[in-house]
Amino acid sequence: MFQQPGDDGVEVEERTIHGIPVTAVEIKTEDGAETLDRAVGKYITIQTGLLSSETLNLKALGECVSEVLTEVLSRYKGSTLCVCGLGNRELVADSLGPDVIRNLSLKVFSGVASLNGLFKSVCSFVPGTAWTNNLDTELMVKGILKEANANCLLLIDSLVTRNPERLCQSIQVSTAGGMNPFFAGRSIDWSSLGVPVISIGVPLAITADTFIQSGVLTDESFTTLHAHHAVAASSFIISYAILRTCWPDLTTQDCIDFIRFNRDVIPYPDRNFDEDDTGDNAVPDETT
């Protein structure tokens, strides 16, 4: 379904990508922004269903998110992209940003001349939180963007929602800068950075007032275990999508293997492992 912008300056498009329902709401005018109480820009919701690596087709979701990211990032082709993972890695529901960055050892790709990329250069970082490092996140982001000569910022963050039905059940992309962060104190004036800000996140928390007023949530609606599964699934999906977007030549299996390698790296001594190496020093096919 496609809805032309009306007098309110809002355009809505609904489609299906790799079998996944996707809704895009584009606010084109200040009147539309005032009506919806949001900044001018495009807001894309990918309806994943309950995020869990046990029940979802993560490859299809990864391809879907990759197509969405490619659409919003392709205008910056040939420039330098900086990927920022906001959040506290020690707090499960706020660890999405750092968890995605953990999956992306981007230095590997900078040395592969034969690998065509969408961007001239891609870098990533985790600024941490003011709660843990007592540093202003906005200043850190500005400094890194300046030193990296970045032309665009891709922001990854855990989100908060007032709608219980969206909790851990969608991936959201916005071209209007940061969305509702997990901690209200982390809100940043992204327009002051001087570069376009594309944000991607997952609603992993619900506001306390909504929790109290709705009366529809049970103890099973949002538990630590639930958040853990949601973060694991969504970080894989987003990491996969970033790799496929930045380096379209990578195959599906390339991306999966790369993410898996970064998560399952084991320390090893300074020696070569032969294919038939056995015994205590052998490298396992998988970690358990």
Language-model segments: residues:
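An N-terminal, well-structured beta->alpha segment
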Residues: 31-75
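Conserved active-site and cofactor/substrate-binding residues in soluble primary-metabolism enzymes
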Residues: 41, 56, 60, 64, ...
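Short glycine-rich or small-residue beta-strand-to-loop segments that form or flank ligand, phosphate
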Residues: 46-49, 80-91, 124-128
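N-terminal active-site beta-alpha-beta segment that forms phosphate/nucleotide-binding
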Residues: 57-114
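Conserved nucleotide-cofactor-binding alpha/beta core module
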Residues: 114-118, 123
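Catalytic-core regions of hydrolytic enzymes
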Residues: 122-151
